[in-house]
Amino acid sequence: IEPFVQIIVQRSEAGELGSPGPQMSKFEVVTAMAFAAFADAPVDIAVVEVGMSGRWDATNVVAAPVAVITPIGIDHGEYLGESIGGIAAEKAGIIGAREGTDTVAVIGRQVPEAMEVLLAQTVRVDAAVAREDSEFAVLGRQVAVGGQMLELQGLGGLYSDIFLPLHGDHQAHPLRFGDLARSE
């Protein structure tokens, strides 16, 4: 990212970034720099985490065939609202129809209010759905030296003896999402 940081610094010092139009947030600048680095690399697959929302987030410019939504809670209430349904509606914005590609929504465990909103968005954009504990799940965990052994149910079948070098059930959740998103 260093070359992209230098471009921003040079343009800033030259006064080229102080235009009277809309200003980019630090997150938007860093996101744009990351996308430029991905294009320059190039990468085959990029895991891009949404900043705060989804609907208006800078990362939403990516034509992503897979959208992963982890469990939704009350966060950033001053920006996203104070209800789970309202927050879910904002976060559902990352599930979008992408021209020329099928969209898959990988959805983690949700309270019913959030799940209803997310599923409604998948219907609107005709996205396929994979829900935790329905289409995919961790079927078993065993403590192992240096981590844990997992048995996962994915869309493509059963995966046994998956070593995760981290301890705890909370560490197995992200692995499920990442493995499923990668397989899509």
Named regions from a protein language model:
Residues I1-V62, I74, E78-G81, G86:
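ATP-dependent carboxylate-amine ligase catalytic core
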Residues V62-V66, G146-E151:
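Short, flexible, mixed-charge acidic loops at enzyme active sites
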Residues G108-P112, Q121-A144, F163-D169:
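Beta-strand->loop->alpha-helix junctions that form or flank phosphate-binding loops
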